[in-house]
Curated annotation (Swiss-Prot):
Natural source organism: Pseudoalteromonas translucida (strain TAC 125)
Keywords: Lyase, Magnesium, Manganese, Metal-binding, Riboflavin biosynthesis
Xref: InterPro entries: DHBP_synth_RibB-like_a/b_dom, DHBP_synthase_RibB
Quaternary structure note: Homodimer.
Protein name (Swiss-Prot/TrEMBL): 3,4-dihydroxy-2-butanone 4-phosphate synthase
Bound cofactor: record note: Binds 2 divalent metal cations per subunit. Magnesium or manganese.
Length: 217
């Protein structure tokens, strides 16, 4: 069923290219994983172009758990420890402690405040002292090697930013249904069509990167 629903958004490589173009233009995309994994669709926006309106959309239409996806280098730069020392989550989701911008926010939970926090954490010269802990933005550590190593939304978001030539920081949040349940591919597709957003699967991204690597070699 996944492929039949996805084909309305083009062939696999076209879906990736459409997602890259949208991100370069400051827009968001929806990324779906495998039916046998989380079977969820996530909003993905670039930290670089993130707006308050986009953050508000994630809070309003999603789970409200907005995460900033970063590679190991930025995690070290900000001195962000993992949320737990012994990760027992089903998909080994690598949460860091939560963060807040030290300046420019009030309570930290509004859409504008969360954008301020993300901008502070992803600034070129960002320092640990720029952030308070805990806060209202969840950090996620992407595995080195991206989706070829771990087929998660975290890695997919960072890989997409790199393919788009943007700073390697993705902002993600799970899309939910009006009743609060998780949106599966049929609902993700419906939302994408209504809001003119590209949809791409993590498997599409794996295929795209593998083909690109083969061309280089």
């Amino acid at each position: 069923m996944i492929q039949s629903l996805l084909t309305q958004f083009g062939e696999p490589l076209t879906r990736v290219e459409n997602a890259i173009t949208a991100l370069q233009q400051g827009q968001g995309v929806l990324v779906v994983d495998d039916e046998n994994r989380e079977n969820e669709g996530d909003f993905v926006f670039s930290a670089e172009h993130l707006t308050t309106a986009q953050m508000a959309e994630m809070i309003r239409e999603g789970s409200g758990i907005v995460c900033l996806c970063m590679g190991e280098e930025r995690i070290k730069q900000l001195d962000l420890p993992q949320m737990v020392t012994h990760n027992t989550s089903q998909n080994n989701t690598a949460y860091t402690i939560t963060i807040e911008a030290k300046e420019g926010v009030t309570t930290g939970v509004s859409a504008a405040d969360r954008v301020t926090t993300i901008k502070a954490a992803t600034a070129d010269n960002a320092k640990p002292e720029d952030l308070s802990r805990p806060g209202h933005v969840f950090g996620l550590k992407a595995k080195t090697g991206g989706v070829l190593v771990r087929r998660g939304h975290t890695e997919a978001s960072v890989d997409l930013m790199q393919l788009a030539g943007l700073k390697p920081f993705g902002v993600i949040c799970e899309l939910t249904n009006p009743d609060g349940s998780m949106a599966r591919l049929p609902e993700v597709s419906g939302y994408a069509n209504k809001h003119n957003m590209p949809v791409v699967s993590i498997e599409d991204l794996v295929q795209y990167i593998q083909i690109a690597q083969q061309k280089v070699s």
